[in-house]
């Protein structure tokens, strides 16, 4: 994930990242809009502006996560509660599911899968939140 400056998005708080494969090739774009504001819907979600697929000329995914965390004062880190961190990991799991999709047909790309499977990647990611190595690095 490499932050990409200079891309116009819906709000100055939203950030854009180019996602690259291990070989350096571009995989897609990830947009993160994490802070609450008066004009923003409540809740947290992942969605795709563009699904990734190989049909025809194919398309690279453009995935976004929206959260409603309290914005910290300028220059300070955003501190999250355990529940907020769990939500972040859950929605980022959905984002990775959308970003790492490798399918021919757009109709089955990313989270466009059976209801009994769509929550699996996000819930697995939630559980990584409590892995000691993850806590040591990010908490």
Summary of predicted features, one role per range:
Residues 1-139:
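Cation-handling catalytic/transport regions enriched in His/Asp/Glu
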